[in-house]
A protein has these predicted regions:
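Disordered, acidic Ser/Thr/Pro-rich linker "stalks" and the adjacent N-terminal cap
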Residues: 580-587, 592-657, 663-673, 677, ...
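Catalytic-core regions of glycoside hydrolase
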Residues: 157, 245, 251-255, 264-424
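Feature activates predominantly on carbohydrate-active enzymes
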Residues: 95-245, 251-255, 287
Length: 735
């Protein structure tokens, strides 16, 4: 099936007719489809028939999106019905006994859409809308249903939350692609987390109401999530405060709720107390509201790497938590793909099917990358093992739609899911007038680069023959590399002035500028490789200096961008494209040195600081520079710092330290750590650490640090036991 659907996608992208073109426009791919192949034009008018109860349904309203006039006397009839209505029973083949199932029958005389429920009927209309693109229909009989009951998105990333307009656009996208869940849980919303007891101010409350209503119109459950774990007290007062807050949200129009206890420690992490609270909420709020869907819960041990089987946190939840409550799970680690074995492991412990929170394409831990690749890696056989599957996206809402397009298809029809084909189709939908430019650019923005979770993605597979030519030293290698660079620069130029999706281009702009730098660097290196003359401008020396200059400009752009103060940086093509150009640079310089007796440095890399150590959650974090400030990227999770373990930052040159501070998220924790500096291979010298007051989580250094010369800094847990901390920031300033 993979090749079949990929070819269809490419035909559509190229505008080439196909006998399957109309049905193949439907996304997600239907479960069952009987195609006769006859294509015909949309009628100029049609008559719509439905029960009075369905006149105000979202399915009936969505039908208006098709540009056909309604005429009570038109010979072409569109019938909308529920399966339990008379018209639905007369439609013929019974539907699968699954929520949101629908059938769509299209003939030259009329259309009949039957849904098991109103949302299923709405999905049938959405499929008709997809099929009717370009003003054509196709005789067909579709029976369709979702593999996963709850499908969609959780806005659960750290960093800049989505704007209100971005959320509205997302909800439109979810409805269009048959996703029925949007969980509102932005970490920076104070009324979701830090001030969870407090009501929203009137203006913010109106925005929540608008989102909830807009979601309803798109067939999406708008979940409002509350995160009380940071400071909850297991008291009647706090229990009632939580229920009261949910009541206030209900009054704003919210009909779906989630409770998060992730990324915390201390009193709030107790499984029995969490279960007791959730059961109380379920009994005294959820079950008393007939129009509210089941409660969703994100536990503290939300992945296998953090689960402590000996303490039995997950088993306690499984045995005591009401079975109607959904339990979220990220997999074998915080960022991990899901397979059947991992689902068997968690489902046995929580005594229900896990509700997957998939941390892709979220980039809050690799903010220097933008992730435009396909959604792949999850098992195609796990549909019976999951109750829900939601994606945590990037803060770049429009760019996230590329991956979300595939996730919608995957959760609807797993067995026929083809990540590559879906990716091709997504590019066409997101930017149809510049699809090839977007595709070319996206090829170099798939992988996450080095990161604390060790989660990587395929990138640069299309460069395999080019890389092989470079490694062999083929004479054709420079031309092959240059062609790729020219295509990348052309794509970036086209996209930078595209006006059809301005929000997407705003999100991509920093990476588009860096892509141009990368392409310029590659072309300069290719000119070097072809240079035979050391006298005529540009000489080899000129091209060498130009190449090194562009690499430094790339580094400057990476570290001057201030979109994210905690982790600046703009990286493109770091997995294959940039290393390939660097290799060509090195081979070219080495060959020139050998032939001309010169001594040019053959490395163009510019990495002045490196991080190492034996704290697994930290050692893969990138190091960045802004002016004189050097920073380690923050981590969003609880750091389990082993006894005696340390991290070390090493500089390529001796630096003079001016100041330093870091935030491990806990007041008074400085006494558990030792900071040392060393110059070259010299002795380690300890630097005193202190907090400015008892409530200050920021750790400051003593005055002796100022003026110290160093090439290495080391921070060690000096206690004899594991320390659980955050890693909010780590900065030092050099002269």
């Amino acid at each position: 099936m993979k090749k079949t659907f990929l070819s269809i996608a490419l035909l559509l992208a190229a505008g080439i007719p196909s006998v399957m073109a109309q049905v193949s426009r439907i996304n997600p791919i239907p479960q069952q489809c009987s195609q006769q192949g006859e294509l015909f034009d949309l009628p100029a008018q049609w008559r719509v028939v439905c029960s009075k109860a369905l006149e105000s349904s979202i399915a009936r309203q969505a039908l208006n999106l098709i540009s056909v006039k309604e005429d009570a006397k038109a010979p072409f009839t569109v019938t909308l019905a529920l399966a339990n209505e008379k018209a639905g029973r007369k439609a013929g083949k019974p539907l699968a006994k699954k929520a949101e199932a629908y059938s769509l029958q299209v003939s030259e005389k009329g259309i009949t859409i039957v849904g098991n429920d109103e949302r299923g009927l709405y999905y049938g209309v959405r499929s008709l809308i997809d099929m009717s693109g370009a003003g054509r229909l196709q005789v067909t009989n579709i029976t369709d249903w979702p593999d996963v009951a709850w499908r969609g998105v959780v806005e659960g990333f750290y960093g800049t939350p989505w704007s209100h307009s971005a959320r509205l656009s997302q909800l439109d996208f979810y409805g269009k692609h048959k996703m029925n869940v949007y969980i509102y849980g932005p970490k920076d919303d104070p009324y979701h987390r830090d001030h969870w007891r407090d009501p929203y101010p009137e203006a913010e409350g109106r925005l929540i109401s608008e989102l909830a209503e807009h979601a309803r119109q798109q067939g999406v459950n708008f979940y409002w999530a509350i995160h009380p774990g940071v400071d909850i007290k297991w008291t009647t007062q706090d229990r009632d405060a939580l229920v009261h807050k949910l009541e206030l949200m209900y009054d704003l129009g919210v009909r779906a709720f989630a409770v998060f206890f992730d990324d915390i420690w201390g009193e709030g992490t107790k499984a029995d107390k969490q279960a007791e609270l959730l059961n109380y909420v379920d009994d005294n709020f959820i079950s008393k509201k007939p129009d509210v869907v089941p409660l969703v819960f994100c536990p503290t041990e939300y992945n296998r790497a953090w689960a402590n089987d000996q303490k039995g946190y997950l088993r306690t939840l499984g045995s005591t938590l009401h079975k109607s409550i959904e339990v979220m799970w990220t997999g074998n680690s915080v960022v991990h793909c899901i397979d059947k074995e991992s689902m068997d492991w968690i489902n046995e412990r929580i005594q229900r099917r896990g509700y997957i929170w998939w941390n892709f394409p979220v980039s809050d831990f690799v903010r220097d990358h933008i992730l435009l690749g396909p959604a792949y890696g999850n098992g195609l056989d796990i549909a019976p093992d999951v109750s829900g599957f939601v994606s945590n996206p990037m803060e770049h809402a429009e760019a996230s739609k590329i991956a979300l397009y595939g996730i919608a298809d995957y959760t609807w029809n797993m067995q026929r899911y083809d990540a590559d084909a879906d990716w091709e189709r997504a590019l066409t939908e997101i930017l149809p007038d510049a699809r090839e430019a977007l595709r070319t650019f996206a090829l170099y923005n798939k992988d996450l680069g080095q990161n604390g979770h060790g989660f990587r993605r395929e990138e640069g597979t299309e460069l395999a023959d080019v890389m092989a030519a470079v490694e062999r030293g083929d004479k054709a290698a420079p031309d092959m590399v240059e062609a790729r660079c020219r295509a990348l620069r052309t794509a970036a130029d086209i996209l930078l002035t595209n006006r059809s999706n301005p929000q997407l281009i705003r999100e991509l702009r920093p990476w588009l500028l860096q892509a141009k730098n990368l392409a310029d660097y590659g072309e300069a290196v290719c000119q070097m490789a072809r240079c035979k003359d050391g006298k005529t401008f540009p000489t080899f020396d000129d091209l060498y200096r130009q190449s090194r200059s562009i690499r430094e400009q790339m580094y400057d752009l990476e570290n001057s961008d201030v979109r994210h103060a905690l982790q600046p940086g703009i990286k493109v093509g770091t997995k294959v494209m940039l290393p390939m150009i660097n290799k060509l640079f090195a081979k070219t310089v080495e060959a020139w040195n050998a032939g001309h007796g010169t001594d040019y440095a053959s490395s163009s890399d510019y990495v002045p600081y490196k991080l190492s150590g034996n704290v697994p959650q930290l050692i893969l974090l990138p190091v960045s520079i802004q002016g004189q400030r050097v920073s380690i990227a923050p981590s969003n999770e609880v750091i389990k710092w082993p006894a005696g373990a340390s991290i070390t930052i090493e500089s390529e040159r001796t630096v003079t330290l001016q100041g330093m501070d870091f935030n491990l998220g806990i007041a008074g924790v400085a006494k558990h750590f030792r900071l040392e500096v060393a110059e070259g291979n010299g002795e380690w010298r300890e630097v005193s650490l202190l907090h400015y007051n008892d409530k200050d989580p920021v750790i400051h250094t003593g005055n002796e640090l100022g003026g110290m010369k160093a090439t290495r800094l080391r921070l060690t847990n000096k206690t004899g036991e594991e320390q659980q901390v955050y890693f909010r920031n780590f900065n030092f300033v050099v002269q």
